[in-house]
């Protein structure tokens, strides 16, 4: 038996996909909180303590901290910084009015994004139709629920990852919501 595997880019004319990494730097105090937590697996924030019981929990909480907030054991959110939100604001402004799709991972990321920006979640078929018609300026999606099967390429060509996932599959599939057959513009 012979198996042939082909990528869509092998036989479809696709626009360019540009991956643009935007570094976000913490202040010295914020970096100290991050580093202390990474080393000690416990940190005191104001009146509450955040701890990680093992390396897997530590990894997830460090990812949360890098995004700007972290959950404690009671699922209460503790804000660390707004640096990613500031960078997100710059990127949205830099899109010069073009529609922007934002991928988030943690619920506290979504809450903070919704509090700061006028965004709409892509959750229903009406949301998808409105996005593809160009009626949504800034939309948010969660890779686990929007990573497969959605056709969002008609609504825009800019995807911003506010927080990354550990899943390469979800990352690639979410990117493929915009960079797919039918997209006319360079995907950023």
Language-model region placement:
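Inter-lobe coupling linker of SF2 helicases/translocases
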Residues: 1-97
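Conserved residues at beta->alpha junctions
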Residues: 25-28, 104, 143, 165
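Generic structural signal for small/hydrophobic residues in well-ordered secondary structure
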Residues: 27, 61-62, 88, 92, ...
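Short, glycine/serine-rich, charged loops/turns that create anion-binding
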Residues: 69, 107, 145
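Short, well-ordered alpha-helical scaffold segments within catalytic/effector domains
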Residues: 81-89, 107, 125-128, 172
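Conserved RecA-like ASCE P-loop NTPase motor core of nucleic-acid helicases/translocases
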Residues: 98-106
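Conserved RecA-like P-loop NTPase helicase motor core
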Residues: 110, 118-188
């Amino acid at each position: 038996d012979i198996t042939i595997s082909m990528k869509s880019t092998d036989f479809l004319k696709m626009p360019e996909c540009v991956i643009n990494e935007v570094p976000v730097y913490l202040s010295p105090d914020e970096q100290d909180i991050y580093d202390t937590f990474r080393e000690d697996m416990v940190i005191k924030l104001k009146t509450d303590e955040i701890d990680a019981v093992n390396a897997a929990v530590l990894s997830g909480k460090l990812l949360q901290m890098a995004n700007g907030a972290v959950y404690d054991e009671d699922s209460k959110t503790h804000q660390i910084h707004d640096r990613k939100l500031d960078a997100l604001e710059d990127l949205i402004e830099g899109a010069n009015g073009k529609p922007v799709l934002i991928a988030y991972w943690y619920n506290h990321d979504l809450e903070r994004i919704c509090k700061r920006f006028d965004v709409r979640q892509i959750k229903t078929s009406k949301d998808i139709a409105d996005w593809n018609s160009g009626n949504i300026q800034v939309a948010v999606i969660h890779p686990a629920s929007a990573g497969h099967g959605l056709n969002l390429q008609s609504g825009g060509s800019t995807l911003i990852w506010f927080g990354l996932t550990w899943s390469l599959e979800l990352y690639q599939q979410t990117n493929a919501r915009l960079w797919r057959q039918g997209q006319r513009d360079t995907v950023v």
